[in-house]
Amino acid sequence: MSVCLAITKGIAVSSIGLYSGLLASASLITSTTPLEVLTGSLTPTLTTLKNAATALGAFASTFFCVSFFGAPPSLRHPYLLYGMLAAPLSSFVLGCASNYQSRKYSKVSKESSLFPEDSKPAASELSDSIIDLGEDNHASENTPRDGKPAATTVSKPAEALHTGPPIHTKNLIAATAIAIVGFVQAVIGVYGEGQFI
């Protein structure tokens, strides 16, 4: 194997490994972080991760392509083709899911804007009811002088805080799995050629 071919394969495998790691990091961040934080303070970080992953995926696919088509016919192994397709396939999965979810979200938001506020179903009153089984002096503090209990404000449940388009965690995990499988088979393929010995 020529030195140039070994270098291009090494760059391709390293790039697909970094690409898989970035997708895994993005999956972990989006699955463990609330939506408000993702759409607020983490947006620049996620944008940077997306741009880096796009660049690494394109870089890896290019070097896998150069390694496959630049090799003599006896060294054109299928793992180079599979590695070349891992990044575009995972990007395709994310692109289709994003397009589907954005169309679905815009359709739901259009339908909800057609109904006036009065015709929307009322929220359940059960989530607003609180029974305080604490001390009696707490109840006397909240009771005004006319004998009626004071109205208390209840914080909204966590589900009410999640607004905006849903995060595509399942699709991101599927794209990450595709990239990881591409990376693992590329490492096994390069190792099988004896490049690491």
Swiss-Prot record:
UniProt-annotated stretches for the region Disordered: 135-154
Membrane topology summary: Multi-pass membrane protein
Biological processes, Gene Ontology terms: autophagy of mitochondrion; macroautophagy
Subcellular location(s) of the protein: Mitochondrion membrane
Keywords (A to Z) from UniProt: Autophagy, Membrane, Mitochondrion, Phosphoprotein, Transmembrane, Transmembrane helix
Modified residues (Phosphoserine): S127, S129
Transmembrane segments: 10-30, 52-72, 78-98, 172-192
Principal location class: mitochondrion
Residue ranges with Basic and acidic residues bias: 135-148
GO cellular component term of the entry, any: mitochondrial outer membrane
Family per similarity comment: Belongs to the ATG33 family.
Chain's role: Involved in the selective degradation of mitochondria via autophagy during starvation and at post-log phase.
PANTHER family cross-referenced by the UniProt entry: AUTOPHAGY-RELATED PROTEIN 33-RELATED (PTHR37278:SF1)
Protein name: Autophagy-related protein 33
Organism this protein belongs to: Saccharomyces cerevisiae (strain YJM789) (Baker's yeast)
